[in-house]
Amino acid sequence: MKKLLLFLLLFPILSMSQGIMGDKTEFSRQDTLRGSITKERSWWDLNRYHLDIKVNPDEKFISGSNKISYTVLDSYNLMQIDLQNPLNLTKAVQDNSELEIIHDGNAHFIKLIKDQKPGSKEEIIVYYEGNPRTAVRAPWDGGISWEKDENGNHFVASSCQGLGASVWWPNKDHMYDEPESMLMSVNVPKGLTNVSNGRLVGVDEMSDSTTFHWEVVNPINNYGVNINIGDYVNFSEIYKGEKGDLDMDYYVLSYNLEKAKVHFKDAIKTMQAFEHWFGPYPFYEDSFKLVETPYLGMEHQSSVTYGNKYRKGYLGRDLSGTGWGLKFDYIIIHETGHEWFANNITYKDIADMWVHEGFTTYSENLFVDYHYGKKAASEYVIGTRRGIRNEKPIIGPYNVNKGGSGDMYSKGANLLHTLRQVANNDIKWRNILRGLNKDFYHKTVTTQEIENYISKKMKMNLKPFFDQYLRDIRIPELEYKLVDGKIHYRWNNVVNDFNMPIDIIVTDHVLGLQNKLRIYPTQKWKSKKIRGSIEIDNNYYIDSKNVI
């Protein structure tokens, strides 16, 4: 019964990871077209999108266009644009000339007539329409959520991480390349409001509809682009942050206004904690928004979506089992954490998705640390270990749009918590986290870049450490035995050259003293004189075994 209750408690997170990553082991041409940097993608660099669409909730229909501005890197005449069935890419135009489109599943290859000269800046407009995929279980099995609120008004939102933004609009659907800016013009029926990323720069009123123009002036990843349509009301506040005044806006359903004004106080607390640990919020120019949606939530850039039903924890549950998880709204903290790790620092390939989810799950621990103390934070992150399965590596296969194990959440957080112990210097550790967000500001990255950066800053060879926790499923096991006043110890169940230092707590029962002792195990037996009994510091994510 205890195992059943634990499974039911952790099911949402397990479902989240399985929905986005799945269990697929065989890959198709479509997977490669979607997941690799094809020749038809690599020759041009994204500059800007202008997505101009009309959303018809009654018919669950979207139509419109995307003007794509780009810089030519290498001369070529075939451009890949992605749009998923059942949507139809109907036309492509450059310099008033309609272009031929070769359709290959969800990839569409546009034959360009104009000579594409390296260094030149060009534009192409693609047109599309249709009934986009309806989200089955958003946000994990995403698409468009076509819902109604309690008053019978349309309540519509997009979610597409993993699945891809091309599920609802045409784009260069690979994470390695981001536009430097984006304009979203979204036409919706009269009486409804659309909220998207960035700042509202214009509203056009028509007799039966309204067009909302939202602009982002920072780089944005495709899945971070969103539409949220409903009977929204707005309230706002100013956060005095590290880069000055940050506009924080909240869009909620009209009947939830008073409830939200109280509950959303977690947003300011989140900014305080994360600016302390990670550095300035990365998108001051675009503001910060929390937007109510009919699904649980997602890290859409500067337009974080929220559907946790105004409860503390994860829909009222504490994923750590410690009680600390009920001190805050999980969705506000977790999804806002992604503004630093997902939207500021973005993986180039979804195989490295732990860079998003591991660091952001770890951010929950840092929120607790900032507001409730280091001991509480340790209890929280250690409590999340019960959700770790260790069945598949965290790093997934490359170039096929496939993530790794769902362990990237809790195991990712615990490997970072373990690294904090190894660093043994909280000022240094905080500087590393802030340095990541400064040195990789608005960049797409590989896990190798992140691993190398941390290794360099810690002045350690951490390759075996990352190989152990990211690319292996075994938990390091510290074998030890106490013989004649000595502790003998070694690592077992580890990759070659794994040599992580670890702290043990030594209690001298004669003198009544307790102190922390750092040892440096390898895969060969080593020994050290001690006096008293020992306890392994449980802040390290390892197993231990007394072999006597």
What are the roles of these predicted feature ranges?
Residues 217, 353, 357-418, 440:
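Acidic/His/Gly-enriched intrinsically disordered linker/tail segments
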Residues 282, 405-487:
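Amphipathic alpha-helical substructures
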Residues 160-161, 268, 273, 284, ...:
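Zinc-dependent metallopeptidase catalytic helix centered on the HExxH motif
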Residues 24, 28-30, 40, 127-236, ...:
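Extended, low-hydrophobicity, Ser/Thr/Pro/Gly-biased non-transmembrane segments
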Residues 88-94, 462-463, 478, 482-539:
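Beta-strand-rich binding/interaction modules
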